[in-house]
């Protein structure tokens, strides 16, 4: 793949593989995603669900495995997004971070089960 092709590579992986870090035009997106990650690791998600287990072995994933669908995860994305509309700024942001984590869990389910 040429350097030009790498610049338009839609996976984004080449930036990290080549040690380039986060593209400046996507810095805010990266920060928001990292805030959602932090909420899952040390915030509400960790307090309620982590139990010193990897993300793939936490209830967020295991329940979907048991029922054979990621529909519950998608429901949570929708529910949290809708609930954020009735909240003030900071609680709404936290709720949307939760929606991001549920979306990531839905992606993980598809990657492992499709």
Annotate each PLM feature.
Residues 1-114:
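Intrinsically disordered, low-complexity regulatory regions
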């Amino acid at each position: 793949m040429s350097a030009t092709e790498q610049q338009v590579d839609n996976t984004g992986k080449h930036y990290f593989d080549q040690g380039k870090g986060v593209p400046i035009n996507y810095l805010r997106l990266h920060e928001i995603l990292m805030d959602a990650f932090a909420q899952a690791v040390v915030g509400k998600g960790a307090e309620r669900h982590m139990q010193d287990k990897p993300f793939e072995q936490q209830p967020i994933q295991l329940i979907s495995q048991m029922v054979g669908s990621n529909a519950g995860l998608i429901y949570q994305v929708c529910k949290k997004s809708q609930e954020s509309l009735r909240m003030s700024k900071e609680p709404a942001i936290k709720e949307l971070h939760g929606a991001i984590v549920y979306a990531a869990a839905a992606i993980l389910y598809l990657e492992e089960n499709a």
